[in-house]
């Protein structure tokens, strides 16, 4: 079999264009992991978020490792009313967490 590979996680905040259109979507990209099973949890200021979450099924990359993404749909009000949002990825018992904070000035 293949050696285990820990996922690399990238978290993108909502774009300013999106916020102007009165939407806010956070995107958590999870890539280069093996085996192809991950658990994704979202948090707002450290408390779990369960609504508006959509996570894709991991798909195999050309290098035989897996990639997945998770989306969190918010309103701009929700986005601005928290200090930080985190995407927490659990893979093979270890956890990677990435956090974004709304920009103070927008």
From Swiss-Prot:
GO MF term (any one)? antigen binding
GO CC annotations? extracellular region; extracellular space; IgA immunoglobulin complex; IgD immunoglobulin complex; IgE immunoglobulin complex; IgG immunoglobulin complex; IgM immunoglobulin complex; plasma membrane
- CDD domains (UniProt xref): IgC1_L
Q: Which UniProt keywords apply?
A: Adaptive immunity, Cell membrane, Disulfide bond, Immunity, Immunoglobulin, Immunoglobulin domain, Membrane, Secreted
Highest taxon of the lineage:
Eukaryota
Q: Name one GO biological process term.
A: B cell receptor signaling pathway
Instruction: Supply the InterPro entries for this chain.
Output: Ig-like_dom, Ig-like_dom_sf, Ig-like_fold, Ig/MHC_CS, Ig_C1-set, MHC/Immunoglobulin
Which cysteines form disulfides? 28-87
So which residues are the signal peptide here? none
Q: Where is the Ig-like domain?
A: 7-101
Compartments annotated for it: namely: Secreted; Cell membrane
What residue intervals traverse the membrane?
none
> Where does it mainly reside?
secreted
Q: Which Pfam families match?
A: C1-set (PF07654)
Please name the SMART domains in this protein's record: IGc1
The further comment given in this record reads:
Displays the following serological isotype: Mgc-, Ke+, and Oz-. Mgc- has Ala-6, Ser-8 and Thr-57; Ke+ has Gly-46 and Oz- has Arg-83.
What does the subunit section of this Swiss-Prot or TrEMBL entry state? Immunoglobulins are composed of two identical heavy chains and two identical light chains; disulfide-linked.
Q: Function of this protein?
A: Constant region of immunoglobulin light chains. Immunoglobulins, also known as antibodies, are membrane-bound or secreted glycoproteins produced by B lymphocytes. In the recognition phase of humoral immunity, the membrane-bound immunoglobulins serve as receptors which, upon binding of a specific antigen, trigger the clonal expansion and differentiation of B lymphocytes into immunoglobulins-secreting plasma cells. Secreted immunoglobulins mediate the effector phase of humoral immunity, which results in the elimination of bound antigens.
Name of the protein in question? Immunoglobulin lambda constant 6
- Species assigned in the record: Homo sapiens (Human)
Print the organism lineage: Eukaryota, Metazoa, Chordata, Craniata, Vertebrata
């Amino acid at each position: 079999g293949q050696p285990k590979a820990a996922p690399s996680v990238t978290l993108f905040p909502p774009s300013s264009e999106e916020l102007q259109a009165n939407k806010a979507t956070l995107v958590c990209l999870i890539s280069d992991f093996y085996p192809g099973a991950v658990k994704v949890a979202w948090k707002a200021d450290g408390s779990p978020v369960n609504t508006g979450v959509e996570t894709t099924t991991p798909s195999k990359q050309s290098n035989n490792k897996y990639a997945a993404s998770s989306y969190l749909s918010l309103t701009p009000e929700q986005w601005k009313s928290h200090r930080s949002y985190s995407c927490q990825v659990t893979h093979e018992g270890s956890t990677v967490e990435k956090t974004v904070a709304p920009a103070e000035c927008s």
